[in-house]
């Protein structure tokens, strides 16, 4: 069977499409991985997707994408992000399946909708809960050649293991660099012998690592599934990373500084409006602050799923000193860290009846039965 898989953002590509493509190939299917344009794209999605061992198309401009998709023929489509319009265009009269964490327009046009957790299902009509694909992606990391012993500066280090995640897009990593650098300076002054690690995403070019190495921030290129369980505490930003932390049982701090807002794109008509000189930035801040307010006080996935504070969060005018104090406070209470780990792992397995069958396997099994 020829299966079209469609996605756009970095997190969806690495955390969702990667395990789905892997499982489809195990089932003997031919896979067409179609990348859509995305305001959150890193610019290196195609390079990363080519590692998956399947045919890759896109990302293309809307006109070229429309013409190309109109000519493609597949037996079914799995939509893992992006507008359902594009998935329907590729599927034509074939079944269109969608996996999503929340409601999006056009879901009514899909043959079947899947989601990860019961809480996510509340806003998606008639969705099937199959578990989190991000969890499957972490398991794929464990199949890499490198092992936990190969952790760079952490290989023979018994101090506080704090790991920083700088973001999937280069402009966000540039902002993160100075913030992380200042946080590390404060922690070195306080702790003396401190060796941080910065886990670089697969979408970063190797040339970026030079600056981070020269600043003794110890950038590392390893799968999150390998490194996260080795960290005592992780500092990150809102996004898929917080689900990786949940599945790894990794305590940490999620930062959403106001100073980063201008680097976050706004899609659709709102995005066009925010490009207006001078006024645009204020409008963007207003739009993004409204989005944050709709999250009911939590910006990380574990806290939203549990509807309680599990991971630490700092939102707004965040200073390096604020973050450093939060890190020091967290690491001083080992009992609390153990409790956080337990809560995260409980959330990770919430609603699972059988860990032996992964989310990607359930998805592929469903498609096989529906398309004999």
Describe every region a protein language model picked out:
Residues 1-372:
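Nucleotide-activated sugar donor-binding and catalytic core shared by glycosyltransferases
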């Amino acid at each position: 069977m020829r299966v079209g898989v469609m996605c756009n953002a970095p997190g969806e590509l690495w955390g969702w499409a990667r395990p789905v493509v892997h499982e489809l190939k195990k089932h003997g299917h031919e896979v067409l991985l179609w990348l859509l344009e995305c305001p959150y794209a890193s610019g290196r999605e195609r390079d990363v997707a080519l590692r998956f061992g399947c045919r890759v198309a896109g990302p293309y401009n809307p006109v070229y994408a429309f013409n190309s998709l109109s000519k493609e023929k597949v037996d079914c489509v799995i939509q893992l992000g992006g507008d359902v319009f594009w998935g329907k265009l590729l599927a034509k009269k074939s079944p269109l399946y969608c996996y999503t964490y929340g409601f999006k327009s056009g879901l009514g046009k899909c043959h079947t909708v899947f989601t990860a957790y019961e809480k996510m299902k509340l806003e998606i009509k008639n969705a099937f809960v199959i578990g989190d694909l991000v969890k499957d992606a972490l398991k794929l990391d464990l199949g890499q050649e490198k092992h936990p012993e190969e952790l760079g500066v952490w290989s023979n280090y018994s101090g506080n293991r704090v790991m920083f995640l700088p973001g999937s897009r280069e402009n966000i990593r540039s902002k993160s660099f100075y913030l992380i650098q200042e946080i590390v300076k404060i922690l070195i002054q306080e702790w003396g012998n401190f060796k941080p690690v910065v886990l670089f995403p697969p979408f970063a070019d190797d040339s970026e690592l030079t600056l981070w190495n020269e600043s003794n921030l110890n950038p590392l290129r390893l799968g999150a599934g390998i490194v996260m369980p080795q960290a005592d505490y992780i500092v990150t930003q809102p996004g898929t990373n917080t689900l990786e932390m949940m599945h790894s049982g990794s305590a940490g701090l999620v930062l959403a500084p106001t100073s980063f807002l201008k680097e976050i794109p706004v899609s659709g008509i709102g995005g066009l409006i925010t490009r207006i000189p001078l006024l645009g930035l204020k409008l963007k801040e207003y739009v993004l602050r409204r989005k944050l307010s709709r999250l009911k006080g939590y910006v990380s996935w574990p806290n939203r799923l549990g509807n309680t504070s599990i991971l630490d969060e700092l939102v707004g005018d965040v200073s390096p000193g604020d973050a450093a104090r939060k890190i020091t406070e967290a690491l001083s209470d080992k009992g609390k860290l153990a409790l956080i780990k337990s809560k995260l792992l409980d959330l990770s397995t919430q609603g699972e009846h059988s860990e032996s069958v992964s989310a990607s396997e359930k998805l592929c099994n469903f498609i096989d039965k529906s398309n004999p």
